Amino acid sequence: ICTGLTLAVLSIVMILYGSFVGRTRFEVKEVTYTSPRLPQAFDGYRIVQLSDLHIGSWQGNTPAIRKLVDLVNAQQPDLIVFTGDLVNHRAVELNDFQEILAGLKAGDGVYSILGNHDYGPYFHWKSKQDQDNNLIELKQRQAAMGWKLLNNEHTFLIQGNDSIALIGVENQGEPPVSYTH
């Protein structure tokens, strides 16, 4: 019984630490990519990749998102890519954060794609039209933040006489449960 109680207390402490302390201890993990196919002009090109903010989970904690934006900008990236799941369900989750996230800066800009949560499939919408309107609003908010959404689109990043393609594809994933009305 003593071992079980110890494990239970340890589990609770770990959950509380992760929920209240660990979740705002953002860390930078640097990865160096090398390839003979990478144009020489892109040697040293810095890309910051962010994903799965699920911004609705940060309600009431704008300082943490400011801290994240400051940390990203301190990396002096050439490019920032956001790889989906900006929101949990609804575009209005961005209300307190849109201006903060607009502060992300990179020489070649901020590009994004949509994740499964961004399409709003896990929310009980009154109608399909409401869900579609939410997606339109989310795309508009990203544009207002200065983010360039690549949804089955591409752009070329140019350095000197060299270029590479940045390609964004639509999320083809399906939610585990379909909520249709």
Task: List where the protein language model places each region.
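Acidic, histidine-bearing metal-coordination/catalytic regions of metal-dependent phosphoesterases
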Residues: 1-46, 51, 55
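Conserved small/polar residues in nucleotide/adenosyl-binding loops
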Residues: 180-181
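Membrane-embedded segments
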Residues: 27, 43-133
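Intrinsically disordered, low-complexity acidic/polar segments
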Residues: 42, 175-176
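Extended active-site neighborhood of metal-dependent phosphoesterases/phosphodiesterases
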Residues: 25, 29-34, 99-171, 175
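Structural motif
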Residues: 37-40, 72, 158
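N-terminal start-of-chain detector that recognizes signal peptides
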Residues: 3-7, 18-22, 52-53, 83-85, ...
